[in-house]
Amino acid sequence: MSEQELLDIFDARANMEAMLVSLAIARGGDEWEADVLAKAHLLSKLEACDASEKMLDEWDLRHQAFHTAIVAGCGSYYLLQMRERLFDLAARYRFIWLRRTVLSV
């Protein structure tokens, strides 16, 4: 994958996420909001722990669950599927970023 392709994936994902968050805020109900808060709480509990290689997978799972919860209220199955595809395309590079940021603490 070229650098340009990577930048395109991240740009598409950022724009998709922004649109989905806007839709989720407009369409999400109390249960959606409660789920976002619960996932944020779980992520923050892990962020309070010391960063280590073994925590990387758990941190990534909770981080992904938090972001998925945020957009879940958008109400569009197909937009969520497109978002998931972009998320998967960026996964390899996300792990490199995690090792450089989360584990470098």
Region annotations inferred by a language model:
Residues 1-26:
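Short linear motifs at protein or domain termini
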Residues 13, 30-96:
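Conserved amphipathic alpha-helical segments that form helical-bundle/coiled-coil interaction surfaces
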Residues 96-105:
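C-terminal regulatory/effector modules of DNA-binding transcriptional regulators
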